[in-house]
Amino acid sequence: MQFLKKNKPLFGIVTLALACATAQAQPTQGGVSLHYGIGDHYQRVTLNYETPTLWSHQFGGNWGRLDLTPELGASYWWADGSRSPGHVWQASAIPMFRWWTGERFYIEAGIGATVFSSTSFADKRIGSAFQFGDHIGLGFLLTPSNRIGLRYSHFSNAGIKEPNPGLDIVQLTYTYQF
C-alpha cells in the first residue's frame, strides 16, 4: 500500500495507458459532448447530442476511416467584464466529418447552421441571428466510450447581412459515446 501512495502519478499513467491500449474507434451509436471555449473577451460552454454515425467509409491500406456524425447543440456564451450584452444563447446543427487516422486519433471538420438569441454580444453587432459555424479540430479516443479533443470554431453570417465581424473560439471537448 505504501508503494501506491508514493507512486500515485506513475500508477495513474499506467492505468490510463492500459485503458487506452484497449480503445478502438468504431462508428458510434451516438453520444453527448461538453465543450468549454475561450475567445476574444468571451467564453462559451456547449452541450451537444451526437447522432449515430450516418455514413462511414473505410479507406484502403492504412488510411483509416471517415465518419459523418451530426451534432445538435445548445451553447451559452458570456462576455468578460462590462461588455454588453453580457450573454447570449445559441442553437446549432453541424454535420461533422471525422477522419480516424488510426485506432485512437481523429481529425474533424464541419460547417452548419446556428442561431443566436441576439444580434449583439460582447460589444459586437453580428448582423443577423443566423450564423454559419465552421469547425476544425483533432482528438483522441481514451476508451471505447470516452474521447477528448481540441476544436477551433468560427461563427459568421457569411456576408448575408452587415456587420459581419464573426466570433472565434478555441474549445476543449469531452465526448461520452453510447
Swiss-Prot record:
According to its UniProt record, the EC number is: 3.1.1.77
Name the phenotypic consequences of knocking out this gene.
Answer: Increase in relative abundance of 3-OH C10 in lipid A. The most abundant ion detected in lipid A structure contains the addition of a 3-OH C10 acyl chain and a second phosphate group compared to the most abundant ion observed from wild-type lipid A.
Gene Ontology process terms (BP): lipid A metabolic process; lipopolysaccharide metabolic process
UniProt site positions, description: Critical for activity: N157
Catalytic residues? H154 (charge relay system), S156 (charge relay system), D168 (charge relay system)
Q: Mostly located where? A: membrane
Q: So which residues are the signal peptide here?
A: 1-19
Xref: InterPro entries: Lipid-A_deacylase-rel, OMP/PagP_b-brl
Keyword GTP-binding on this protein? no
Which keywords does this Swiss-Prot/TrEMBL entry list?
Cell outer membrane, Hydrolase, Membrane, Signal, Transmembrane, Transmembrane beta strand
Reactions catalysed, semicolon-separated, are: a 3-(acyloxy)acyl derivative of bacterial toxin + H2O = a 3-hydroxyacyl derivative of bacterial toxin + a fatty acid + H(+)
Stated membrane topology is:
Multi-pass membrane protein
List the SUPFAM superfamilies: OMPA-like
Provide the Gene Ontology terms for cellular component.
Answer: cell outer membrane
Compartments it resides in: Cell outer membrane
Q: Which GO terms describe its molecular function?
A: acyloxyacyl hydrolase activity; protein homodimerization activity
Q: What does this protein do?
A: Has lipid A 3-O-deacylase activity. Hydrolyzes the ester bond at the 3 position of lipid A, a bioactive component of lipopolysaccharide (LPS), thereby releasing the primary fatty acyl moiety.
Annotated family: Belongs to the PagL family.
What is said about its interaction partners and assembly? Answer: Homodimer.
Domain notes per entry: Consists mainly of an outer membrane-spanning beta-barrel formed by beta-strands both N- and C-terminus residing in the periplasm.
- Protein name from the UniProt record: Lipid A deacylase PagL
Q: Which organism is it from?
A: Bordetella bronchiseptica (strain ATCC BAA-588 / NCTC 13252 / RB50) (Alcaligenes bronchisepticus)
